[in-house]
A protein has these predicted regions:
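N-terminal auxiliary segments of SAM/dcSAM-dependent transferases
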Residues: 1-47
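Conserved alpha-helix/loop element of class I SAM-dependent methyltransferases that forms part
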Residues: 65-84
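A short glycine-rich, Lys/Arg-flanked "PGG" loop and its adjoining helix->strand segment in the class I
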Residues: 163-175
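Short alpha-helix
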Residues: 200-216, 222
Length: 250
């Protein structure tokens, strides 16, 4: 409790010097000093990832980051033996860590991210047919029935409320299209979502299941796995595969 009080004090001092600073506002909310937002702000995401785009891949290698491998393996398992992933969206593509894994499965591979710094790295890595700098929910909503598969590795952990982003994904998927994503797993006593002190959200399995059902996405599989290590401890998450079965919800 004392550490959190100290952190809130530091963050409030920061905001006095820089009113409206997106990082300070988000971290203060994660420390319990402000109401929890339903998702991280666009400004926080863009500034946070622009700041460490150059060191992003090296840092994640140290942490044993596995989310790209886990989500692409889940996509491959959901496809029938003769199917490709078709037209694929890498949703929150970052530096393009998924591209080398998705490219062999995809007829076309598009990427979208809010951070221009991360997109610059993705361009250098290659493998994409198109890269766009945009907010994910709005971007998907503007492209109805565009993709056969949407893959999102560790992007939805910056969303607490999942309804809008999942609804947009359903709009963007073709009929029978697949959505594969990872999120961090909340502790067993949590029934919805939680903004953690690290600034990322964690989600409970029942909440994920309810959110998918609410927008008319059919849950195919949900697996519990280790996404990476943090402070020498495994970070557990959910690997989710859902299908657009054409069910319509209000």
């Amino acid at each position: 409790m004392g550490d959190l009080e100290s952190a809130r004090g530091v963050l409030r001092d920061w905001l006095e010097l820089e009113p409206g600073n997106a990082e300070a506002l988000h971290l203060l909310a994660s420390a319990g000093g402000l109401p929890v937002p339903v998702r991280a702000s666009d400004a926080y995401i863009a500034e946070e990832f622009d700041a460490f785009a150059k060191s992003f891949d090296a840092k994640l290698e140290i942490l044993g980051y596995k989310a790209p491998e886990l989500v692409t393996a889940a996509l491959a398992s959901a496809l029938s033996a003769d199917d490709s992933a078709g037209d694929v969206l890498d949703a929150g593509c970052g530096t393009g860590l998924c591209s080398v894994l998705l490219r062999p499965m995809a007829r076309r591979l598009d990427g979208v991210d809010l951070s221009r710094g991360m997109l610059s790295k993705a361009t250098e890595r290659g493998g994409y047919d198109d890269l766009e700098c945009a907010e994910l929910t709005g971007y998907m909503a503007r492209h109805p029935s565009r993709w056969d598969s949407i893959v999102s590795a560790d992007t939805l952990c910056y969303f607490g409320e999942l309804h809008d982003v999942l609804s947009a994904a359903k709009v963007a998927l073709k009929f029978r299209g697949l959505l594969v994503f990872s999120v961090e797993a909340a502790a067993s006593e949590i029934t919805g979502f939680l903004l953690q002190h690290n600034g990322r959200y964690a989600h409970a399995r029942p909440y994920i299941e309810q959110s998918l059902a609410a927008v008319g996405l059919e849950l195919l599989t949900i697996e519990h796995d280790t996404l990476r290590a943090e402070v020498m401890r495994p970070v557990r998450g959910w690997i989710v595969v859902a299908r657009n079965s054409g069910i319509h919800r209000a």
